[in-house]
Amino acid sequence: MASVTEHAQWGVGCLPPLNVDKQAIAAAFSRAAESYDSAANLQRETGHRLVQLGQQHTGFVVLDAGCGTGHFSQHWRLLGKRVIALDLAAGMLDYARQQQVADDYLLGDIEHIPLPDQSVDICFSNLAVQWCSDLGAALSEFYRVTRPGGIILFSTLAEGSLDELGQAWQQVDGQRHVNDFLPLQHIQTACQYYRHHLTTALYQPRFPNVIALMRSLQGIGATHLHHGRQAGLQGRQRLAALQRAYVMQSGGYPLSYHMVYGVIYRD
């Protein structure tokens, strides 16, 4: 069962760019296209919350930036919006197109959005910007393509996410094998140039065993590491060692996601 705690944060600049292999990330998510929806419990929960933050906005054109399989593209469309689905992973975008979830489909990078200035009313990006090399560049692009009076909605992961898994791997072989996520303060810094509001929440599902935990990551394509190594399912002996090293809580194996929800107002 997931437990959630939350509180509001407001932005307080240059952020260090991450070393991100975009082609490898796109390939990892393309491979996960068929399994993604059945495994994406966290993405569904965060996405629905993000939609609630902006669904009263009267704007008509929505950009779903990092659309994945298009689950939320379809959700916005059912709310009467015209939806542009954008993703870096060709496999994900092809799957979304097959499901006919949007009005237009764009293969592209959030940090270099292939749209003219001021072309959408709502820019929606659920759990995608943590894969960017430069959060500031992504937010700048969101702001550029959004019309004045529009709204930008994004969610991302902050430092501390997947920490239990990283600590367990450290016990096994001295390496964490999980991605590093930006500290909350760095996310606040990236938002400081805009009128905005940030909210944080802790999402902490528990799993019956380490294999189920690792499969939850593999099913959504999230086993790719920023610096290039894969952290997918391992051999039996390594998984057994990982399970021994993993600290149980309340009869399960927890995995923390430190969520950040952002709303930026396009002035």
Swiss-Prot record:
InterPro entries according to UniProt: BioC, Methyltransf_11, SAM-dependent_MTases_sf
E.C. number(s) listed in UniProt: 2.1.1.197
GO biological process, any: methylation
Keyword S-adenosyl-L-methionine belongs to the record: yes
One Pfam family of this chain: Methyltransf_11
Record's catalysed reaction(s): malonyl-[ACP] + S-adenosyl-L-methionine = malonyl-[ACP] methyl ester + S-adenosyl-L-homocysteine
Domain of life: Bacteria
Pathway this chain belongs to: Cofactor biosynthesis; biotin biosynthesis
Gene Ontology molecular function: carboxyl-O-methyltransferase activity; malonyl-CoA methyltransferase activity; methyltransferase activity; S-adenosylmethionine-dependent methyltransferase activity
Keywords in alphabetical order: Biotin biosynthesis, Methyltransferase, S-adenosyl-L-methionine, Transferase
Protein family (similarity comment): Belongs to the methyltransferase superfamily.
NCBIfam families: BioC
Function according to Swiss-Prot or TrEMBL: Converts the free carboxyl group of a malonyl-thioester to its methyl ester by transfer of a methyl group from S-adenosyl-L-methionine (SAM). It allows to synthesize pimeloyl-ACP via the fatty acid synthetic pathway.
Name used for this protein in its record: Malonyl-[acyl-carrier protein] O-methyltransferase
Organism: Yersinia pestis
UniProt lineage: Bacteria, Pseudomonadati, Pseudomonadota, Gammaproteobacteria, Enterobacterales
Encoding gene per record: bioC
